Amino acid sequence: MKYAFSTLGLPGTPVARSAALAAEHGYEGLELRAHTEEPLHPDTPGGERVAARRTLAAAGVTVLGVAGYVEVAASGDDGPVLAALRSLVRLAADLEAPYVRVFPGGGGLPEADADAHAVRRLRAAAPYAEGHGVRLLLETHDSHPTGAAAARVLDRVGQAGAGALWDVLHTWLAGEQPGESWRDLAPHLGYVQVKDVASAQDLTPLTLGAGVLPLDEVTAHVPSGGWLCWEYEKRWYPGAEELPGQLTRGREHLVRLSRDRSAPAGRSAGSPGEPGGAPPRPP
């Protein structure tokens, strides 16, 4: 396996510091949060992008993905959405990152309408992304939290420049088992975001292995050589433990899981309070 972590866990941290932490703790990659609060985002000047790329290369760390906030299934005109997608693609290309994360964001819309928006926009933007050596990844999130929902869109898009990002928290919260998520996402998958929490009611981030998410079952499905990216949501939970002190423990936990490639026999969904159990599927 290859391991990365998201800079969402290091709000506002300079690129050099994030790269040094990754190298020090054995992570090959970083997922960069592309927001104006952070050092790198779509409005960052070209010279700063070049400097960041050189800093990362000197540390031996690659940019796995650029985590953007474009909502491809949301209502509204296509023009601003497509322009924002192109800006993220250019940022990723400048940083030599293979992926750009996008959100669905279709909450409040009928499912068919949200799907249609996402399909139309991803179809339009995917060739541009592919031409820059980048792939747009629709995250399992908000209006499309399951592998089934993301795949429903991506099956219709049908282009190499669009794929999926499996956020294991949201598929679990939606009641989807890891095997079900993998079945639907595997043909489209870019990489997997892992994390851990205490329960479905308490989403404060924990170090990997300290919570209830079925990370053993998730990693059992990911093929050798795939990327696992730890998204520790410190930005949204400022009272959570600082990430740097957890990086070694988190990576060691993923390494242990990756060495055991078989899922536990007889594992089934339990209550949200049970280790590894998923919340009951909504009616």
For the regions a language model picked out, list residue spans one by one:
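Surface-exposed loop and edge beta-strand positions of immunoglobulin-like domains
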Residues: 6-8, 139
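Conserved phosphate-coordination/catalytic loops
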Residues: 9, 43-47, 79-83, 116, ...
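Histidine-acidic metal/acid-base catalytic patches
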Residues: 1-4, 11-26, 53, 57-60, ...
